[in-house]
Each structure stands twice: as C-alpha cells, then as structure tokens.
C-alpha cells in the first residue's frame, strides 16, 4: 500500500509528517523549515503559499490568512473578481504540502490523514475532506488533533488507563481537550477553548508595546504605516520566540520611519518579565477553558495523569508555569509542540496501512440515544458525542400493578420530552409475571457497534425473557437535522424546563397516590375510620386533579395529601412506640434480644448501636 502522509492543517501554520519504519518523521519544506505558514497570496496572476506569502501579508491586500476559521461555512474570498471558498484556499496549502512530501519521497502521494480540532462539527470535517480532494488527496481519515498529539507521545503504549489534558495554544486558536486512554482506545471526554486566542495575540501585545514606546519617544504612530507594521510584526514574532530561551532580547529596526530631522530607528530591549506582564491577560484567558474542560469531563486536577502541550506558543515559560499551577503537574516536553499533531497523524496513517497495530480509531454518536419513560420523558442512556463502539444498560420497572407488558420506544435527540425527539423504533417485552408496580426488573441495554448500528435489548431479570430491535444507521440524519435538533434544544430550554417540572410533579403525585393506597392497606385496623376517610378523600381529589391540566391545582392537592401522609406516619410512629414500651414493661429481656430498632426511644451506650443511629 502506498504511503499515507499525516497533515496538521493549522490556522496559522501547517506541518507534514510520514512514518519511516516505526517512527514518524517531519518533512522539511524547500526553505528548510519544518512548518509552513497557512497563508495564500495572489500577486501578478501568481499564487504564493507559505513563508513567501506571509512576508507580504500586510502590504498585499490579496493575502489570505486563518482560512481554517471559515471551514464549513458559506464564506467566500474575492480576489480580482474571482470568488474562492475556504476549501479551495485550504486546498492550495495542502497542494503545497503534498508537493513537499512528493519531493522528499521521490514518488507521488495521494493518500493522507488530516487533523482537525476536537470541537469541529460534521460540516467542518467534511469541508476539510473536500479540501483534500481538491488538492488531489484521498483523505483516509479525519482525526482529532488532541488524539494525534497523544499518539505522538506514545501514550497508547502505556499499560494502565490514563486521563490526559491536551493544552493546544496555536497561532490563531486555543483549545483544551481531556482524553481517556486505555487498551489503545482514545476517547475525547470534553473540549473547551477560545477560537479568537493564539500566538498572533501574543505577537500583537509586543507590537502594541513597540508602537507605544516609539510614539512616546518620537511622536510618530507606526501603526499607520503598513511597511513599518510588517517589520514590527516580524520583529515581535522573533522577540517572542527569543524570550522562550533567554531573559531579554534586543529589538533593532533601523530606518523604521522618518521625522523632520531625518530617518528614525527603533532600538529597544524587551525583557521576559516585561513580556509576561504584557501577556498576562492572555495567559489568564487560557485558564478558564482549562477549568471548563475538566469540569465538563467530571474531573479535578488531581485526576489528570498527563499534560501535553501543543502549539508553538506553549513554549512561552509563563504559559507552561500557568498550566503547571492550574493542573498541578509538569507538562510533557518530549516532542516539538509545533510538530506533535502532524506526527500523530502520520502514526494514524501507519494504522491504516497496517504498519501500526493495536490502536483503535473511534467514531462518535452525533445525538443522544434513549427510551421514553413515564410522563412522556426521554431517559438518555447514551449521551451525544459518546465514542463508539459502546454499550450501556439501565434497569427500569413497571408503572402499574400487574402490568403484563412494557413498550420500549427508542429515541434520538437532545430534548427532555419524548415527543420532541426522533423515533428510531419501537418494540414490546411481553409476558411479564403479575406483580405490584415497581417490582419487576426490566433491564434495557443499548449496544452500538463500530459501524454505528444500534441494537436495543429489553430483558426481564425475573424470567430472563428478552426482546430486541436492531436499528441500522442510527446517525442517518442530515447535518441540518442535527444542527436543528441541537439548536431546538437550546432555544426551547425554558419551555422544556417547565414541561420537565410538570412531568416530575405528575410522577411524584402519582407515586404519592400509590403510597397512600399501600399505607392504608398495610395499616388495616390500626387506622381510625375518620383518618382513613380523610386520606381516601384527599387521594381521590389528587387523582381527579391529575386528570386535568391545572398544575397549581395538582400542586395544592398533592400538598394536602402529603400532610395527611405525614399525620398518618406520626400516628403509626406513636402507636409503635406505645406498643414497644408495653412490650418492654412486660419482658425487658425479650426487648434486648429483639431485632426491632429501638435506639430512638432509649439511651444506648453501645458504640455500634450509636453508629446505627447516625
């Protein structure tokens, strides 16, 4: 099988790697650099890509940068009367990388693994695939950047399960992902970030500082001069990189401008501490998504086993220190953060060609899956974005006494009410032995295989009888449908909350009616006729209210019945106490040997009994 190249198609820089033997190797571009700027420029009917395009970004209006931000949208770029889609611009970057790989390998390259941020939706991923196709590449797999980074660090080779935090501060975007690794399986637990924060912002604070200092000294505003701004940008980027290794750097830009008395030069010493002061607000902005990602994954910093840094801006010592302080662990520094994602993509290429074994590539469920339960609610078993294959079981029971069958209504969607979600299928589990409500144990299992085929099984744990349904292509929804359903869930959150509260109220009221009926039966002759009639009246009033739509009436009748239940419980308690005291008076020894928990009624010195009271 021909080579499958790994491509990190970044917002500001891209990188390409290939698997040589067992090791990924980054391929240098013709200029000798290991990364290529994701910049395209049009000049004199010529298309330029990479460093040459970046160098004239400010002075040439036909220069396109950060096109990745627009992938999956209908955004267009107009250049000299011609429109280009984000896919076409990205394809030009990919063609450049493809050409670099072909020059290195000495053969044509037509297969690639391309990485995308973990938060990319289906349309953004599809747009990335389309860009590869335009560039003449068959995109074998689109994989998540944090997964690729974890692969490059060899974390799939560890024996025990691990939770990994991937801190990715690129040129134009920032995101944090939490991954769980085990048995070669990579699962993205959560992702958070800021797509308007990156290395460019760190350059900008230096540029702003240089402009302010120069203006203070010379009364000249360099931000109004395009040529000067291009030189400032290059100098700021270099200074930022220098300060990752040294405590201060000299910025020297002769003939940057001209004043009344001749040429003006910019000479300034920038210390690391001053840079950290300028960038402090940016560094603090990275911490909130870091905390959010851990919160969404249900983890604290102590649960994180490894921290991986991705992106050139993570070389900034203050960034590394902030991550260490927040997570409480030293980040991994074994792999170049600019190259780690491309190297992981190359390893995935090796998985596809069969050169790399024991790594499982996973897809995810685009929407939550569950069943309808009492009150017309959807009870979710498998959450949206769960990696597949997966399996989940939950035990349910009957809603009525002597219920002979249960209907299993399989649903897909994000809304709390069953009627608002998509029906995938229905089936029935029959011949349930007669029993009071709540007694039968019905286990419902959702099983999704690697192809996304859902198998739902309902099993009566008492008789071991089971019934199932197989649903082909559970994710056969258009992107528009998925987007609409998620959007509906957001827009209707308040209305859904009210309906959910109503459903909860009705379920609680229904349970209360059942509880009162059972209590009256259990008490038998121990309840007075007056109390019994009062309870029956209040119970019937609540049942009648449940048949209507007046929520306030249901609430009021439920509270009335709850008070009756409380009064009954108090009387039962008092009767039990009196009976207990009589029994103690008649036979103290029998009382001590009794299994009745009487700790509430007399002082007990024994330590174990004291524990039982707590």
From Swiss-Prot:
One Pfam entry name: HSP70
Keyword ATP-binding recorded: yes
Biased composition (Basic and acidic residues): 490-509, 529-542, 599-614
Keywords: ATP-binding, Chaperone, Nucleotide-binding, Phosphoprotein, Stress response
Region feature Disordered, mapped onto this chain: 490-510, 524-555, 575-614
InterPro entries per UniProt: ATPase_NBD, Chaperone_DnaK, Heat_shock_70_CS, HSP70_C_sf, HSP70_peptide-bd_sf, Hsp_70_fam
GO molecular function, one term: unfolded protein binding
Phosphothreonine, modified sites: 173
Induction remarks: By stress conditions e.g. heat shock.
Family membership: Belongs to the heat shock protein 70 family.
NCBIfam families on file: PRK00290.1, prok_dnaK
Name of the protein described by the UniProt record: Chaperone protein DnaK
Source organism: Staphylococcus saprophyticus subsp. saprophyticus (strain ATCC 15305 / DSM 20229 / NCIMB 8711 / NCTC 7292 / S-41)
